[in-house]
Amino acid sequence: MGCSSSSAVKPVSASVATLLDAGKSKSLGSFQVALIVDPKDARLDEVRDVLARSFAGTTEAAPDSATGWVYDCTVEIGKPLETLSEARVKRFAWLAKYMVQFAMIRNGVFALLDTEGKVVAAAVVVLPGAPTAEVGCEQMSILNKVGMPPPAGDNGAACGGADSRDGKLANAMGRLHKAHAPTSLPHMYIYCLGVAPEAQSKGCGSALLGWIGEAADADGVAVWTETAGAENKAFYSSKEGFTVKGREAVVAKGDAKKGEQDSTLELLGMLRPAPLPVAAPLSS
């Protein structure tokens, strides 16, 4: 039996066209946010690099809590890496390619540029009305473009393997989204948001998240995301008023024969509510 791909569907949020000059960029004070829709745009390489390094972590910056758990099978959240292996670099470079390809189909690649035009942060955002997960043959189509994931080295084989944990995480994200996001209404979905390690703690993430909130308000919709770790929870709640709507324990079973223990990640589903409708003025 054949199947169809959604690769030709590219929804555009009305707010994006309004807020971004010529539908492409907008000044945010010290930064500029850009919507990237051209697959030949040279900045896509910078976006992939920023997302890969942000999620992988470095010896000076902690990895992303959720994808770090997928790779390492540990929940040492907030700690920089002791070493950065070549296998880790390759795995997260592949992950960034996959996420960007997923986003390009949905017109959802946003880059934050500094005053020199360098990408310092990026987000994959599913705009209102677009599918929040791969549909039909889409996953196959993306894999045909980016290739299969390279093996996870380091501790990747523990607790059933990184690919198994990746599937568990994706399923948990889907369950949280279905159970707690406003799925009956159009909403924005932050699939991922990352800041270059060297640009962290400089307002980049706040600026990009703030713009996403501005765009959502212009569309009159809520914003949903999944995340893990106290630091990420605090970032979303303090910057844009996200609240936790659901939690799910994602468990990777350890092999007792190998001396492995189970590893559990607490995944959070967080929501920024839609703006209240503006009341019509009272007539005299």
Residues covered by each model-derived region:
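Conserved active-site alpha-helix within GNAT-family acetyltransferase domains
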Residues: 206, 218-220, 229-252
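Short acidic, low-complexity intrinsically disordered linear motifs used
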Residues: 1-12
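Conserved beta-strand-loop-alpha-helix junction that forms the acyl-donor binding cleft
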Residues: 191-200, 224-234, 251
